[in-house]
């Protein structure tokens, strides 16, 4: 009987820890690379995230890059990223489609879209 009581106490403790971790996990974070594999691209160039999620843009190669969101200056990162590994994060608080581009390389097709649900 005592073994059984100890088992249930341990299970209760484990389930409490798991529930705490489940609800304490921060919003999902995704990553988009700028200049992937030596190309003037965002990789991926299309991404779907949830409201409250963050996306980190990482300068991979071929600087300089920036990220400008059409109609959303508050999300844009106008400063040019020159160093490989340089990054910045954008958090999306409203659902919608967010088109973005690298201004220096938009003519080369360096554009993308983030769908926020």
Question: Predicted regions span which residues?
Answer:
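Extracytoplasmic copper-binding redox domains, predominantly the cupredoxin/blue-copper superfamily
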Residues: 25-117
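Bacterial N-terminal signal peptides that target proteins for export
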Residues: 3-15
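Bacterial N-terminal signal peptides
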Residues: 15-24
């Amino acid at each position: 009987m005592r073994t059984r009581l100890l088992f249930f106490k341990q299970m209760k403790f484990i389930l409490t820890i798991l529930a705490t971790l489940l609800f304490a996990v921060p919003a999902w974070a995704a990553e988009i690379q700028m200049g992937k594999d030596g190309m003037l691209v965002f990789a991926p160039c299309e991404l779907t995230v949830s409201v409250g999620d963050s996306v980190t843009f990482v300068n991979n190669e071929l600087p300089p890059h920036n990220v400008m969101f059409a109609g959303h200056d508050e999300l844009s990162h106008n400063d040019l990223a020159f160093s490989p590994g340089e990054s910045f994060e954008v958090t999306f608080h409203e659902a919608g489609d967010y088109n973005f581009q690298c201004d220096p390389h938009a003519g080369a097709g360096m554009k993308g879209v983030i769908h926020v649900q």
